[in-house]
Amino acid sequence: MNSLNSFLSEAQKNRHAIGHFNFVTADVLRAIAEGAKEAGAPAVMVGTSEGEAEFLGMTEAVALVKAMREELQFPVFLNADHFKSFEKCRQAIDAGYDTVLIDGSKLGYEENIVLVKQVKDYAGDKVAVEGELGYLRGSSEVQRKVEISSA
C-alpha cells in the first residue's frame, strides 16, 4: 500500500481531499472506512483525540485500523488528532499511528516550534507530523469558550 504522503501528494495534484473522521468504536471505524471505499475515495484518514485514544487504547486503535485496512483492501490511515504533549505523541508513534497532529496552540510561537520539532525528531521519517499554531475555529470546545459572531 502507498504511504499517506503519496496519497496526500496525489490529492493535492488532482485537487481533491482525503477525508478525516474521528472514531471511538469499531462500528464507527467500519462505517467510515466502508463509506469512503463505497464513495470511491482513494483513501481515508481516521483519528482519535487524546480522550478517544485513552478510552479505546492506542494499541487497540492501531490494531483495529490495521485489521480494517486488510479486510477491506483499502488505505485507512490513523491520526493522533490534536495531541497536546510530546509524551502522548511519543506513545502514539510507538503504538504505530501513521500521523500525529501535535497541538501546541496554547503555547507561545517559539515554544510551539520547539515542541513540533521535538515530535518530528522523534518520529523521523516513519510518521507524518503536523503542528498547529494558534487555533482553528469550528471545534465544539472552541465554540463553547469563544464567542463567535453570526455576522
Language model segments and positions:
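N-terminal amphipathic alpha-helix/helix-capping segment at the start of soluble metabolic enzymes
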Residues: 1-19, 66
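Hydrophobic faces of well-ordered beta-strands that scaffold small-molecule active sites
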Residues: 17-22, 44-48, 76-81, 100-102, ...
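N-terminal glycine-rich phosphate/pyrophosphate-binding loops that anchor nucleotide-derived ligands
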Residues: 20-37
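Active-site beta-loop-alpha junctions enriched in small/polar residues
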Residues: 24-26, 47-51, 81-85, 105-107, ...
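Active-site-adjacent beta->alpha loops and helix N-cap segments on the catalytic face
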Residues: 27-30, 54-62, 82-91, 104-128
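Active-site cofactor/substrate anionic-group-binding motifs, chiefly glycine-
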Residues: 38-93
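Glycine-enriched alpha-helix->loop->beta-strand junction motifs that scaffold or abut catalytic
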Residues: 40-41, 94-100, 125
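Glycine-rich tight-turn/loop motif centered on a GG-T
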Residues: 46, 51-56, 98-115, 141-151
